[in-house]
Amino acid sequence: MLLLISPINTEEALEAIEGGADIVDVKNPAEGSLGANFPWVIRRVREMTPEDMLVSATLGDVPYKPGTVSLAAMGALVSGADYIKVGLYGTRNYDEAVDVMKNVVRAVKDQSDAIVVAAGYADAHRVGAVEPMEIPRVAADSGADLAMLDTAVKDGKTLFDFMDMEKLESFVSAARDHGLKSALAGSVGREHLKPLHEIGCDVVGIRGAACVGGDRNTGRIHRDAVRELKELLDSF
């Protein structure tokens, strides 16, 4: 299981790199769960990250505007992102989600082999977004590479407050059945890593647990916390 760490700036990115993260995921929590950062930040993080380490960029908690989102995907791509994550926030159902993702996939795959991630929300019902269990099918039918879940509302509730391990295992299995990788995030802590590993999750996304004090908003990512998480994952 790969460790994805989500820094908000170059200082945190360096901590993630030095701590041994597999994927450095540039985001901007000030703009939402999967808030987008600026192209120049993504570019600088790519420049400072070793070539054998992947850089991911979130496009935001996106609206149902396929043109806008596909153009944003190109921005992430030319900034150097290897993973391009789309938070399907404003897409209310399968059809809208596939429409957005198909256009993102076309924009990206016409230019590169970057990995496209369809990201839904375990608490989708709180924001009117497409249901989480639809995400593997959305990803597969649009030609994306990876199906992901996070939480939309960051109010202390975790992924596990909305989906139990049986449901999460079904999500991972559905992704695998479609030939996709899976990723899970949403206030994931150390205690969750082994259960997620056991259900076959491919990527785990973390910010809070890698921060000093464990707070995704007021804390800062520290290499020691990242290293401890990576060592724990490697022990499974």
Curated annotation (Swiss-Prot):
The keyword Lyase applies. Pathway: Cofactor biosynthesis; methanofuran biosynthesis. Keywords: Lyase, Schiff base. Pfam families: 4HFCP_synth. GO terms for molecular function: carbon-carbon lyase activity. It is an enzyme of class 4 (lyase). SUPFAM superfamilies: Aldolase, Inosine monophosphate dehydrogenase (IMPDH). Catalyzes the formation of 4-(hydroxymethyl)-2-furancarboxaldehyde phosphate (4-HFC-P) from two molecules of glyceraldehyde-3-P (GA-3-P). Belongs to the MfnB family. This is (5-formylfuran-3-yl)methyl phosphate synthase. It comes from Methanothermobacter thermautotrophicus (strain ATCC 29096 / DSM 1053 / JCM 10044 / NBRC 100330 / Delta H) (Methanobacterium thermoautotrophicum). The lineage of its organism: Archaea, Methanobacteriati, Methanobacteriota, Methanomada group, Methanobacteria.
